[in-house]
């Protein structure tokens, strides 16, 4: 099947699953099965369409058969299709068991319509239709929030972003006479895109992507949504905002230097502040939402490095920045799906989302705990997992940036590299979470083979590294990294220690109390005290003070 046929089938499955899940919503279990199976099949078709275009390295165009909707699939947006398809597959399967909980409402209509709208936004050949489909997707996401206050906050901020994007589209139409992306690209080579339109687009799409300080809806929406919905917010909805920002920045291929620097600065602020705010949270979904902001910032750092490379006319910087950002976009979606779905499984079993109350959960849920440990290690960018591979390529782009002749680039390159370094169930549920964890391992170990595939999305070749170490050897070294401590322990351990007696810990003669146990809050306290002025900015400079705060 061609990529257009695959994408037609995928959208049809999403729409059919949404309609049938709504019609059978009176029977929750049946509705869950229909939504889950239909969404999983639609996601498979979507990922297959993206993989076909990416491996072929040639874009295709056509139309959706259900409606008169012109589409184009390039190797660049094929990466988004693969990301949406992989995450949608496991979220849909997970959602089948999710419907078995007594407190869960049917969500098949909203989730499948969200996926269909997201796919249509990615493949849109017209910027106006891109904005319309992104709006439909965002509205579906709003209805997935379980609390009306958080839904109103997201609705208000989302409509502000849409208004800015509509103004940007109107200005584009007045200036260029079209909203077709191919025609815009050709005409902007003669008449470059104005910075006023670019700023409107970056703010509008930035509200959708959740870049700081436009992130007001992100933690509240994630904390008050179901686990499948929260996973889609991070892996689908916010990534569409990044696609919009990148699309505007690449049109015409003549971006000025300050655009790239602005994206780098926004990425650095989002990555650092998002990771810092995560230390204050106890609700696991709210904590993961702030870590999503951190990774959105890291992805934006890579994409910003690519845009900076365009302005400086440095092909290696363009290739490294874009490939690193795109690979981390895919990797983040995988390991964040592991964590959100794993957190949902814990809530399903215990009824708690407070991490301070989940001590010893590994004994009750060993499979989910191991899978979440893999996801956490990937989020921490530890080798040999996929989070390390994407961030390492972004590091390389910063080193390349520091070698540039431009003074501002030589200044920002090392600073950005240092900033990035400090940022730091049931059967079907378990299968979905474990499968995603396995994907995280594969994404790291197989990075030497996967990264060249992503370079098809960048019209410039990656520079080959000057090394005599083969790709299989690199893979073996990555696999050996987590095994090395155990090997050293086995070799260096002495004779077996004598049996020890267990008793209460010595606490200066006082009785041991629960308050004496080291908690996550206490562990992070030194960092909170060191950055107290930054953390207080949430109260002093709150742009959404009229609605529920950050």
Q: What is each stretch, according to the model?
A:
Residues 1-9, 16-109, 177-189, 456-457, ...:
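Transmembrane helix-loop-helix hairpins at membrane boundaries of multipass inner-membrane proteins
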Residues 18-22, 93, 275, 484-494:
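Alpha-helical transmembrane segments
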Residues 46-55, 441-448, 490:
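Alpha-helical transmembrane segments of multi-pass membrane proteins
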Residues 59-75, 401-411, 460-474, 513-515:
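Interfacial loop/helix-cap signal at membrane boundaries in integral membrane proteins
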Residues 71-85, 193-205, 408-424, 466-485:
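Hydrophobic alpha-helical transmembrane segments
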Residues 90-100, 105-130, 139-429, 442-447:
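Hydrophobic transmembrane alpha-helices and their helix-loop junctions in integral membrane proteins
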Residues 430, 435-443, 454, 458-550:
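Membrane-interface and transmembrane segments of multi-pass membrane proteins
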């Amino acid at each position: 099947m061609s990529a257009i046929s695959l994408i037609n089938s995928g959208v049809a499955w999403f729409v059919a699953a949404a309609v049938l899940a709504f019609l059978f919503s009176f029977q929750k279990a049946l509705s869950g099965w229909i939504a889950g199976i239909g969404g999983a099949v639609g996601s498979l078709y979507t990922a297959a369409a993206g993989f076909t275009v990416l491996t072929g390295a040639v874009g295709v165009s056509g139309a959706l058969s259900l409606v008169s909707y012109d589409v184009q699939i390039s190797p660049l947006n094929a990466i988004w299709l693969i990301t949406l398809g992989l995450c949608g597959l496991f979220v849909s399967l997970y959602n089948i068991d999710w419907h078995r909980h007594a407190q869960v409402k049917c969500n098949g209509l909203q989730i499948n319509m969200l996926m269909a709208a997201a796919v249509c936004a990615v493949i849109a050949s017209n910027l106006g239709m891109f904005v319309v489909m992104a709006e439909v997707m965002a509205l579906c996401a709003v209805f997935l929030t379980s609390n009306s206050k958080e839904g109103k906050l997201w609705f208000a901020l989302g409509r502000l972003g849409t208004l800015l994007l509509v103004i940007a589209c109107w200005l584009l139409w007045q200036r260029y006479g079209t909203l077709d992306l191919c025609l815009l690209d050709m005409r902007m080579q003669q008449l470059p895109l104005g910075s006023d339109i670019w700023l409107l687009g970056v703010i509008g799409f930035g509200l959708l992507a959740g870049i700081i300080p436009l992130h007001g809806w992100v933690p509240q929406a994630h904390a008050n949504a179901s686990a499948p919905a929260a996973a889609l917010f991070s892996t689908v909805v916010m990534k569409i905002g990044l696609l919009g920002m990148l699309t505007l920045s690449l049109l015409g291929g003549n971006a000025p230097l300050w655009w790239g620097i602005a994206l780098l600065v926004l990425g650095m602020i989002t990555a650092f502040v998002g990771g810092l705010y995560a230390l204050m949270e106890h609700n696991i979904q709210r904590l993961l939402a702030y870590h999503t902001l951190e990774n959105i910032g890291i992805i934006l750092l890579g994409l910003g490095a690519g845009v900076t490379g365009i302005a400086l006319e440095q092909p290696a910087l363009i290739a490294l920045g874009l490939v690193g950002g795109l690979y981390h976009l895919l990797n983040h979606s995988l390991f964040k799906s592991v964590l959100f779905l794993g957190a949902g499984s814990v809530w399903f079993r215990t009824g708690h989302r407070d991490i301070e109350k989940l001590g010893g959960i590994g004994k009750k849920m060993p499979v989910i705990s191991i899978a979440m440990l893999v996801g956490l290690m990937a989020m921490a960018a530890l080798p040999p997992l996929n989070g390390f591979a994407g961030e390492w390529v972004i590091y390389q782009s910063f080193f390349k940036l520091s070698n540039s002749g431009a003074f501002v680039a030589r200044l920002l390159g090392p600073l950005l590299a240092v900033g990035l370094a400090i940022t730091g169930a049931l059967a079907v549920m378990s299968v979905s979470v474990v499968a995603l964890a396995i994907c995280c391992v594969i994404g790291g170990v197989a990075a030497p083979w996967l990264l060249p595939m992503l370079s098809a999305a960048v019209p410039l070749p990656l520079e080959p590294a000057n090394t005599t170490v083969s790709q299989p050897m690199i893979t073996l070294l990555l696999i050996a990294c987590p095994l090395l401590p155990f090997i050293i322990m086995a070799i260096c351990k002495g004779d077996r220690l004598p049996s020890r007696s267990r008793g209460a810990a010595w606490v200066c003669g006082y009785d041991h109390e629960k308050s004496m146990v080291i908690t996550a809050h206490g562990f992070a306290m030194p960092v909170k005290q060191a950055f107290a002025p930054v953390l207080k900015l949430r109260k002093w400079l709150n742009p959404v003070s009229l609605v529920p705060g950050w």
